[in-house]
From Swiss-Prot:
<comment type="similarity">
    <text>Belongs to the NhaB Na(+)/H(+) (TC 2.A.34) antiporter family.</text>
</comment>
<feature type="transmembrane region" description="Helical">
    <location>
        <begin position="203"/>
        <end position="223"/>
    </location>
</feature>
<keyword id="KW-0812">Transmembrane</keyword>
<dbReference type="GO" id="GO:0015385">
    <property type="term" value="F:sodium:proton antiporter activity"/>
</dbReference>
<keyword id="KW-0739">Sodium transport</keyword>
<feature type="transmembrane region" description="Helical">
    <location>
        <begin position="304"/>
        <end position="324"/>
    </location>
</feature>
<keyword id="KW-1133">Transmembrane helix</keyword>
<dbReference type="Pfam" id="PF06450">
    <property type="entry name" value="NhaB"/>
</dbReference>
<keyword id="KW-0406">Ion transport</keyword>
<feature type="transmembrane region" description="Helical">
    <location>
        <begin position="392"/>
        <end position="412"/>
    </location>
</feature>
<feature type="transmembrane region" description="Helical">
    <location>
        <begin position="358"/>
        <end position="378"/>
    </location>
</feature>
<feature type="transmembrane region" description="Helical">
    <location>
        <begin position="136"/>
        <end position="156"/>
    </location>
</feature>
<feature type="transmembrane region" description="Helical">
    <location>
        <begin position="98"/>
        <end position="118"/>
    </location>
</feature>
<feature type="transmembrane region" description="Helical">
    <location>
        <begin position="23"/>
        <end position="43"/>
    </location>
</feature>
<feature type="transmembrane region" description="Helical">
    <location>
        <begin position="325"/>
        <end position="345"/>
    </location>
</feature>
<feature type="transmembrane region" description="Helical">
    <location>
        <begin position="239"/>
        <end position="259"/>
    </location>
</feature>
<comment type="function">
    <text>Na(+)/H(+) antiporter that extrudes sodium in exchange for external protons.</text>
</comment>
Amino acid sequence: MDITIRQAVLRNFLGNSPDWYKLAIIAFLIINPLVFFFVSPFVAGWMLVIEFIFTLAMALKCYPLQPGGLLAIQAVAIGMTSPHQVAEEIANNLEVLLLLIFMVAGIYFMKQLLLFIFTKLLLSIRSKITLSLAFCVASAFLSAFLDALTVIAVVISVSVGFYTIYHHVASNHSDKDINDDSWIDSQENRKTLEQFRAFLRSLMMHAGVGTALGGVMTMVGEPQNLIIAKSAGWHFGDFFMRMLPVTLPVLCCGLLVCILLERFKLFGYGAVLPERVRQVLTDYDKQASAKRNRQEKVKLLVQALIGVWLVIALALHLAEVGLVGLSVIILATSFCGITNEHALGKAFQEALPFTALLTVFFAVVAVIIEQSLFTPIIQFVLQSSPSAQLSLFYLFNGLLSSVSDNVFVGTVYINEARKAFELGVISLQQFELLAVAINTGTNLPSVATPNGQAAFLFLLTSALAPLIRLSYGRMVYMALPYTIVMTGVGLLGVEYLLVPVTEWMIQSGWISLPHIAAGVSITH
């Protein structure tokens, strides 16, 4: 059937997104200039921020790059901000872009080692409580040094691999679609498959929360951490020590929640690996190990050594994070024999869409700076007592991060806090404490929904989610106990532990104030 040009344009616009979503974006693009020119630039700026948060919240309807990018282009075109201001924001945060481009790609070439580690964990530990704890701890440790997206991508790869193996055995057809259960005729096999799905769901959620628990602790754990660390003038060790008064209690309580959920089988947790599935997977692993030749074993050893280099380089701050990632790419590809251009290109596919989206974030941040959108909120917070400021920053960050992207929220708030310091409104010591409150507030409560954590969103939109019946609602439900405990313990840490423990560490010589002075631009 022939369609009109108008229908064709509407169908092409934002692809398979729902019509109501397309019309909402078109309405935003029509209303924004009218409000900017005829009502108030300040109101138009806030409308842009709310609309951009809306595109992030609707990430499952349409990837936010396209609608958010259209809104950002229009904002620059009508004069909400200038191309120069956008370029300046991008230049200020070049380190973060390099982290996403090179570090994620670098870890892609270490996937063999990470797959090997998680496979051995899954098959060698029989106790579900111990296994869940191991996955959570392993994800937390890896996310402290690697990118959380990459860690969750590896766990997804392992889970999809195992699911595929068992599905083929259960259906007696290795060539059938793993999304099709109609070939599994035995009721017992179907029951086993459902239990296996529940088992994988719980492991994936533990691993996802583990990336948040570890990611908050170091400056490379999450992209926004690097922005906050740069603004405060902290290196790897400084950042880790500064966060410890809040992150250590949260880590301990998070792991305790993991144990309790599995022990009492709450919130959809507690399913064990069916013995039949374990046998199938163990047999497969034995065959794979027997086929592994010396060349492949050497590759695993090389990747382990590169992992050691990565940890040392980050801990001693031997180079900028992105450059360390580039060194990982060069070392891993050189010594593992990956020299084909197309094989190299695959490593960059995961990170580049998010890198482009982050660049759009910076355009919206430029609007916020140009129009002074957050100034009233910051002034309200800064009028309260210094101790109340910390809790308010933590809560405001947490609330926004649970519905929006935490990179965006963290960037906005640290810029505003830095501006207050440069104007002499707050002291250097208070600015540093606020930086801790912003970082923890941005990272911890954001596990509430997939919108807040990039790793959770990646899991929800992955090929694994429909296989194990992991929906948006189920993710929110399974994350709820973690959200309550991590947010609550984080708030108590900011309120009661942060100031005294930080002062004690300064007196003990464990940390010192960085050499940044009021009036110096954030770019330096």
